[in-house]
Amino acid sequence: MIGRYGGPDKRRSPRHDRRFMATLEYQGNTHEIRTIDISEHGVLIPKRLPPPIGTCVKLTLTIRNEASEFEGVVTRHTRCLVNGVESVGVGIDISSNEYREFVKNKILIA
């Protein structure tokens, strides 16, 4: 099956187009970003200079002025569109049960 941005679709759960403020931290750097999409297993974010695949990251998602912090791993780089402009998307796998509950209880109802 072909994914949304032309590559193979390897998703374990459906994507939800949701734009939330997020803070990405890795290798001593902090970046303020917005999500492109979210699933129960991770997020896709835009990043012009993406961290290498395999990089451990900390992602803080802010929804309705409430911040929640999760740890994940960069699993892929892909092409994506952000406001009609082609960009690099960074797929971050977040495999904690807390994150899945967060998505079910906060994201899907937002």
Kindly give the residue locations of the regions a language model identified.
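Short, well-ordered loop/turn sites that connect or cap secondary structure elements
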Residues: 16, 51-53
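A residue-level detector for short acidic-glycine micro-motifs
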Residues: 26, 37, 76-78, 94
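Short polar/acidic secondary-structure junctions
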Residues: 27, 49-51, 62-66, 79-80
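Short, conserved charged micro-motifs
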Residues: 53-55, 100-102
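Short conserved beta-strand and strand-loop elements enriched in small hydrophobics
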Residues: 20-24, 54-68
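N-terminal helix initiation/capping motif
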Residues: 1-38, 101-110
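Short beta-strand-centered aromatic/proline hotspots
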Residues: 33-34, 70-77
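Short, solvent-exposed secondary-structure boundary/capping segments
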Residues: 44-47, 78-94
